[in-house]
Amino acid sequence: MASFTASASTVSAARPALLLKPTVAISAPVLGLPPMGKKKGGVRCSMETKQGNVSVMGAGVSAAATAALTAVMSNPAMALVDERMSTEGTGLPFGLSNNLLGWILFGVFGLIWTFFFVYTSSLEEDEESGLSL
């Protein structure tokens, strides 16, 4: 893995008597981005099992009630569509977020179909051409 660093060090002097303090060299892993502080942190996951005195009959009834309630109350998920986001899974036809894209697709398909039609009309029709039955 290669790492690129960029650093700059400049000294400015307006007059010989007034020297400005030299700027400190700044090292960043990527040119143009500020350096990120190293934070120590993390995520700790754990799982524990709680065992209780749940009757089998009560669990079956509650599961059936939950399934019935879910079936009755389920609504389709609504996606947040922003211009910066992709249109996958948003319910837009063909994933087209702009009507102009549909016309472009239609025009390209029509242009290719026109070229194919003109090309096939200029072919000779004989027994081995496969264009006639």
Curated annotation (Swiss-Prot):
Source domain of life: Eukaryota
Compartments, record wording: Plastid, Chloroplast thylakoid membrane
Lumenal, thylakoid side: 80-99
Membrane-spanning ranges: 100-120
Disruption phenotype: Plants have no obvious physical phenotype. However, there is no dimeric photosystem II (PSII) and there is only a 50% rate of normal oxygen evolution. There is an approximately 40% decrease in the amount of PSII and the oxygen evolving complex in these plants. The monomeric PSII that remains functions normally with respect to electron transfer.
InterPro entries with a match to the protein in the record: PSII_PsbW_class2
Pfam families linked to this entry: PsbW (PF07123)
Membrane topology summary: Single-pass membrane protein
Transit peptide limits: 1-53, 54-79
Any one Gene Ontology cellular component term annotated for this protein: photosystem II
Keywords annotated in UniProt: Chloroplast, Membrane, Photosynthesis, Photosystem II, Plastid, Thylakoid, Transit peptide, Transmembrane, Transmembrane helix
Biological process according to GO: photosynthesis; photosystem II stabilization
UniProt topological domain (Stromal) ranges: 121-133
Binding partners and assembly: Part of the photosystem II complex. PSII is composed of 1 copy each of membrane proteins PsbA, PsbB, PsbC, PsbD, numerous small proteins, at least 3 peripheral proteins of the oxygen-evolving complex and a large number of cofactors. It forms dimeric complexes. Found in monomeric, dimeric and in etioplastic PSII (i.e. before PSII is fully assembled and functional).
Record function comment: Stabilizes dimeric photosystem II (PSII). In its absence no dimeric PSII accumulates and there is a reduction of monomeric PSII.
Family: Belongs to the psbW family.
Protein name, UniProt field: Photosystem II reaction center W protein, chloroplastic
Organism: Arabidopsis thaliana (Mouse-ear cress)
GN (gene name): PSBW
